[in-house]
């Protein structure tokens, strides 16, 4: 019965993705697709899955082509949130995917204290056949937020991208193209000093331990010589 109901039509209303970049260059992604259920059968099918509490991603994908991973992996910690959107319309509904994407940005050491992060465009899967591109249709947006200590945030080319007040970038459709995105993080001088003295202490401790071992061997050798005499 429900297999037949799933075959009914839907109308996409909007798609949004929030990408929070971590200090490791990974990303925590929240995608939300809002759509209209265009028939009574589809509304019953959606409400049925909603009442089950937990359903597989494949079950929800039948309601909209936008319900899929728009960023490639390795991916982990998937959480699916489905809801009716009565504030939008009586037949509106939404499905959100929340997950972690590893290696979203590649990290490269630029100096003693500076690390540069560059977007790995191969992780983008926003439109079929356009891997590596920011390809967004009408009513589609992507917000990318960088770590609080990110500096020198750069995007090339700049046209088509809005810099936000919360240390991030925003793309709004319709738009299609390739952008290079990068930022830097600087290790605080205090942390560098702390790590220096910690390493110095560790080296000194290791040297002292080696000294004790050598001293022990010398004492043992001395006693063996005495015994032979």
Pin down the residues of each PLM region.
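Juxtamembrane/start-of-transmembrane alpha-helix segments at the extracytoplasmic/lumenal side
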Residues: 194-214
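Early extracytoplasmic/domain-onset interaction patches
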Residues: 10-49
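Beta-strand elements of well-folded, non-transmembrane domains
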Residues: 21-25, 33-39, 99-105, 121-123, ...
């Amino acid at each position: 019965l429900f297999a037949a109901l799933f075959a009914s039509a839907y109308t996409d209303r909007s798609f949004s993705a929030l990408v929070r970049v971590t200090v490791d260059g990974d990303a925590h992604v929240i995608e939300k697709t809002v759509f209209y259920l265009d028939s009574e059968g589809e509304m019953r099918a959606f409400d049925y899955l909603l009442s089950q509490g937990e359903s597989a991603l494949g079950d929800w994908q039948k309601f909209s082509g936008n319900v899929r991973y728009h960023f490639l992996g390795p991916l982990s910690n998937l959480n699916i949130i489905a809801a009716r959107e009565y504030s939008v319309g009586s037949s509106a509904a939404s499905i959100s995917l929340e997950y972690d994407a590893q290696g979203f940005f590649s990290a490269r050491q630029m100096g003693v204290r500076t690390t540069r992060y560059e977007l790995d465009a191969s992780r983008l899967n926003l439109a079929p056949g356009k891997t590596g591109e920011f390809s967004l249709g009408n009513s589609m947006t992507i917000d990318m937020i960088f770590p609080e200590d990110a500096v020198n945030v750069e995007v090339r080319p700049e046209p088509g991208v809005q810099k936000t007040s919360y240390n991030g970038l925003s793309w709004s459709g319709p738009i299609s193209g390739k952008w290079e995105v990068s930022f830097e993080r600087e290790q605080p001088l205090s942390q560098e000093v702390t790590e220096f003295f910690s390493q110095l202490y560790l080296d000194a401790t290791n040297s002292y331990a080696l000294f004790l071992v050598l001293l022990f061997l010398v004492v043992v050798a001395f006693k063996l010589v005495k015994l032979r005499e």
